[in-house]
Amino acid sequence: MKRYVLDANALLDYFGDRPGKLRFAALLKEAAHSEQRLFLSVINWGEVVYSIWMKRGEATARQMRIAISKLPIEIVPVSAEDAFEAARLKAIHKLPYADSFAAALASRERATLVTSDPHFERLGKQIPVLWLR
């Protein structure tokens, strides 16, 4: 079974008609019709909502919240152990805070990280990445 962890910008690409949209749409379609699993840390979910709220306003952020809930994506809560691993990855690789949670979740789930964010190049080959660029 394929397992993917979504970085916030994967969803922002999708909802924002950015270059990664078509590749991410194909991933969503595959997840809806297969055993493939898509995970999103609640931290990265909050990052998506915040980004949309700041760019398009509260009403649009609330609509996106509903739209995301209808996608074949599992929103994953964060434990203290997850936060520790995210802090470790942030300290070692100098990742932005929210990005470190996506990386920690991908590591824990032995999943491929889905992103178009160049910050994740800092991980080297530690975590497999599906680039949406």
PLM region spans:
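Short, well-structured N-terminal submotif of metal-dependent ribonuclease cores
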Residues: 1-40, 53-66, 132-133
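Acidic, PIN/NYN-like endoribonuclease modules and their adjacent C-terminal/linker elements
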Residues: 1-3, 75, 103-133
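A generic structural signal for short hydrophobic patches within well-formed alpha-helices
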Residues: 11-12, 45, 120-121
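Short, flexible helix/strand-to-coil boundary loops that buttress conserved ligand/catalytic motifs
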Residues: 15-16, 52, 90, 124-127
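Anion (oxyanion) recognition and catalysis
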Residues: 32, 69, 107
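Helix-loop "lid/cap" segments that line or gate small-molecule binding pockets
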Residues: 51-54, 72
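Active-site neighborhoods of divalent-metal-dependent phosphate/nucleic-acid chemistry enzymes
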Residues: 74-114
